[in-house]
A protein has these predicted regions:
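Short beta-strand-to-loop elements that line the ligand-binding cleft
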Residues: 68-75, 158-166, 173
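Ligand-binding clefts/hinges and TM-proximal coupling segments of bilobed small-molecule sensing domains
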Residues: 22-26, 68, 145-162, 200-207, ...
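Beta->alpha turn/N-cap motifs
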Residues: 34-38, 72-77, 86-99, 123, ...
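Periplasmic-binding protein-like
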Residues: 36, 113-121, 190, 194-233, ...
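C-terminal motif of bacterial Sec signal peptides marking the signal peptidase cleavage site
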Residues: 16-19
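Short glycine-rich His-centered loop
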Residues: 29-52
């Protein structure tokens, strides 16, 4: 009888532990890192609200899938590092899905936006082709598809590359004349010129073919979050929410 009672008590204890574990999982808050300024994907508006395409897509996906998250605006390099060391579970920051990133351990979601990269010059610049960059300097943001695009052309067209840690500083380097051009994701650049009044312009014919942005994790233990993102992304595409978000920021 005592043995039966002990077995029953053990079973009840196990049930209690499993129940508590389930409740803890249900209340999990996923930590998601993002950039500080990558308009229109993430930025602080005039009301001091952190907004953008990435911000709204994540919110819509989380609502659709019923998970909680803590979005932390850390900056690109700090956000990447946070995921790499496990201080954040995922990254959403206009991260281009690239083979080199996959090989280094990043695990990406389905693409949620296809972006091209473009060269950008000062408003009064006469540069209109890659050939015009010979002997000059092109500014890029560290770790971005824009940097990759510029590096893929620098030897062929004979220009140097200067690396910056954030987009605003990179833009200013071109405006001040230190760099002849910069290379940035096209939607980002178009929005910054339009809304920020930057004395920059986008020459025709100096644009890449483009690649998709993805939500990314590094720890395979966070696959559940990635699966929920993919499922939610599919649903918000189908119900029209996704297009409404794009229209809100890109039109």
């Amino acid at each position: 009888m005592k043995k039966i009672m002990l077995t029953l008590a053990s079973a009840l204890m196990l049930f209690s532990l499993v129940s508590c574990k389930g409740k803890k999982a249900d209340g999990k808050v996923w930590v998601v890192a993002t950039d500080t300024v990558f308009r229109p994907f993430e930025y602080t508006n005039e009301k001091n609200e952190f907004v953008g395409i990435d911000v709204d897509i994540l919110a819509a996906v989380a609502e659709n899938q019923g998970f909680k998250y803590d979005l932390q605006s850390l900056g690109w390099d700090a956000g990447v590092a946070a995921v790499q060391v496990g201080q954040a579970d995922a990254l959403i920051a206009g991260a281009t899905i690239k083979q080199s990133r996959i090989e280094s351990g990043w695990i990406f979601s389905d693409g949620y936006y296809n972006a091209t990269q473009t060269f950008v010059v000062a408003k009064d610049s006469t540069i209109s082709s890659y050939e015009d960059l010979r002997g000059k300097t092109v500014a890029v943001k560290n770790g971005t598809a824009g940097m990759d695009f510029a590096n893929s052309l620098k030897d062929k067209y004979g220009f140097k590359v200067a690396v910056f840690e954030d987009s605003p500083t990179m833009y200013q380097d071109v405006i001040l004349g230190n760099s002849a051009a910069c290379c940035e994701d096209t939607p980002i650049m178009a929005d910054n010129i339009k809304t920020g009044g930057l004395a920059l312009k986008i020459p025709e014919g100096m644009e890449s073919e483009g690649a998709p942005y993805g939500f990314a994790i590094m720890n395979p233990a966070n696959q559940e979050l990635l699966d929920m993102f993919n499922a939610g992304l599919k649903n918000i595409r189908e119900n029209g929410t996704y297009q409404k978000i794009l229209d809100k920021y890109l039109k």
